[in-house]
Amino acid sequence: MEYEGYNDSSIYGEEYSDGSDYIVDLEEAGPLEAKVAEVFLVVIYSLVCFLGILGNGLVIVIATFKMKKTVNTVWFVNLAVADFLFNIFLPIHITYAAMDYHWVFGKAMCKISSFLLSHNMYTSVFLLTVISFDRCISVLLPVWSQNHRSVRLAYMTCVVVWVLAFFLSSPSLVFRDTVSTSHGKITCFNNFSLAAPEPFSHSTHPRTDPVGYSRHVAVTVTRFLCGFLIPVFIITACYLTIVFKLQRNRLAKTKKPFKIIITIIITFFLCWCPYHTLYLLELHHTAVPASVFSLGLPLATAVAIANSCMNPILYVFMGHDFKKFKVALFSRLVNALSEDTGPSSYPSHRSFTKMSSLIEKASVNEKETSTL
């Protein structure tokens, strides 16, 4: 998210902001620090974009066309779509950073791109929370879950998630704006005062706007509560309940489920905690050294967006649902290579089918000792 002017009239100066996309403006840092950070952001965001589009795209194809429609595949597809859309719009902001934070895409795209990024953030977080709650219910109430857990209900839940994310992301459509800076650049920022855009500079003396500040606080606190604190509390409570239930009933004979649970919680916490913490501190920016924001926000933002390319690994490929298809996918790739290169030492399709069957049986046996 851009670390840019709070609004167009420099009510709080360019050091005070509440950007709603995933690029950080580094004008507050020194020239060398800013340049290094810009290069760092472009490289990291490009890597995340590539891995995210590839990984989430593969998940969408596999879950949609190669797997039976189940509740889990509904979760996985929606989670992958949210992250995929997030990654699709990253090139716009990568270009923004590469052009030294000169916005050339117009006011409408400033609003739309920021809205979509925020919407996908909320959607991903809510879906992870729903997945955690669904798994918890499956362990605590297996009979009820078996009778009421349906694909139709999963689709309805996803619709609610996307609509709720739309509502929480709507401030981007209202407050995002563009303005020319004193350096001759156009910046995309949050105009919480809703005043007519005017060129601003670092030398402008900050004024007081209680309405704009209250809007800033409302957006930031809402984002922290709904996009982090409440989901983290629910996710942690769900998995702690699962661990307690499995330990008490001795349903798990291996430590793998617990490793997955710990990985999910720690990864989610580490990815988003620094980001939300720094933006909460930004509400009282005068009491915090400028270097904390100029250097900390780029790193925190990069870590946060990295979650979008790690989700396929953490929430899909570590689960049992994709084990069978991973073998089939490998078999298809080998057969394709064999057709292109002619006779080779690769095993035949029949041998791969047999091996796939054996691995599937082993997966079923393992699943009986694990709930994830």
UniProtKB/Swiss-Prot annotation:
Q: What's the protein's topology in the membrane?
A: Multi-pass membrane protein
A GO BP entry is: inflammatory response
Mark the residues carrying the PTM Phosphoserine. Answer: S338, S348, S351, S357
Record topological domains on the Cytoplasmic side = 63-73, 134-152, 245-260, 320-372
Q: Which InterPro entries match?
A: CML1 (IPR002258), Formyl_rcpt-rel (IPR000826), GPCR_Rhodpsn (IPR000276), GPCR_Rhodpsn_7TM (IPR017452)
Subcellular locations according to the entry: Cell membrane
The regions listed as transmembrane in this protein's record are 40-62, 74-95, 113-133, 153-174, 224-244, 261-281, 300-319
In which tissues or organs does this protein occur? Answer: High expression in heart and lung, low in small intestines, colon, kidney, liver, uterus and brain.
Write down the glycosylated positions: N7, N191
Keywords, comma-separated and alphabetical: Cell membrane, Disulfide bond, G-protein coupled receptor, Glycoprotein, Membrane, Phosphoprotein, Receptor, Transducer, Transmembrane, Transmembrane helix
Pfam families noted in UniProt: 7tm_1
Extracellular compartment segments: 1-39, 96-112, 175-223, 282-299
PROSITE patterns listed in its UniProt record:
G_PROTEIN_RECEP_F1_1 (PS00237), G_PROTEIN_RECEP_F1_2 (PS50262)
Alphabetical GO CC annotations of the entry are: plasma membrane
Residues recorded with modification Phosphothreonine:
T341, T371
Q: List GO molecular-function terms, semicolon-separated.
A: adipokinetic hormone binding; adipokinetic hormone receptor activity; complement receptor activity; G protein-coupled chemoattractant receptor activity; G protein-coupled receptor activity
Task: Give the disulfide map.
Answer: C110-C188
**What the protein does?**
Receptor for the chemoattractant adipokine chemerin/RARRES2 and for the omega-3 fatty acid derived molecule resolvin E1. Interaction with RARRES2 initiates activation of G proteins G(i)/G(o) and beta-arrestin pathways inducing cellular responses via second messenger pathways such as intracellular calcium mobilization, phosphorylation of MAP kinases MAPK1/MAPK3 (ERK1/2), TYRO3, MAPK14/P38MAPK and PI3K leading to multifunctional effects, like, reduction of immune responses, enhancing of adipogenesis and angionesis.
The family this protein is said to belong to = Belongs to the chemokine-like receptor (CMKLR) family.
Q: Which PANTHER family match?
A: CHEMERIN-LIKE RECEPTOR 1 (PTHR24225:SF49), CHEMOTACTIC RECEPTOR (PTHR24225)
The molecule here is called Chemerin-like receptor 1
Q: Which organism is it from?
A: Rattus norvegicus
